[in-house]
Amino acid sequence: MKKITLFCLLAAVMLFAASCRHSEKTIVFQNYEYEDNPFAETDDTVGVQFSIKIQLPLLEKATEAQRPLMQAMTDSLLTRLLEPYYNGKAPDQAIKDYCDSIRSEFNDWALLDDPTESGMPNYQWIQELSLVPELETEQMLVYNGSIYAYTGGEHPSTTTILFLFDLNTGKQLTEQELFNWAGDAPNSESYNAFVELMKGMIRKMCDATDDFTADDIDWDNVAPNGNFKVTKDALVYHFDVYEITNTNAGPIDIVLPNHEVKQFMKEGTVLYNYWFKK
């Protein structure tokens, strides 16, 4: 039995304290959900599983002044998560197009075998996409995005995409804006020192766990990858499995305390001010 639901739900309203330019910032999260799980457990569908689940709490335009900022952040989120199916469309239409494409791909794949000839096939296709708002400050918002896919085999694929937004501009903050080793005039000495900081933190992780060792790390590829978020007191770089680790180590988060990162930062950014100008 096919069941698809697509709806919008006002999920949360958060008030941010006054900034130097705005007396109040009101951010409304509108939750877009889509579920498709068409195969009931019957004799005809034993071993067949197909499901899509999407949960995207996107930013809504609470005021006219916020409209371009919220739209810019939505564009950044959906372009990364739903590519190539988002091209300025309404979010619900982009989500539907994305899911229809996955369903079509599953149908083509499932028809490759004839269950009447090969016995009951074990078709499993699970796709889940989610966003979680994490750190929320007066001037920044962190999102943690995850794309989970399992189409058979030994293990699923999970891709984590992190977003750090400047709420004053609607821009996604990148290494170029934040660090002195990036941008128009990169500092190679600073960059190399930053890489060594990352490697040093991984070595500490290896020493502190029995789950993996230094032999499970591809040390030549340890470097800033642009996939980072921030917490109240740390910078966190995320690497999916195979980027710098094997399946034994799995995905890895490199947590760098802000006092260690300070020497590499450009002053005056919203992140620098949040950490060091309180």
Short names for language-model regions:
Residues 20-278:
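Compositionally biased intrinsically disordered regions enriched in Thr/Gly
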Residues 1-28:
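Bacterial Sec-dependent N-terminal signal peptides
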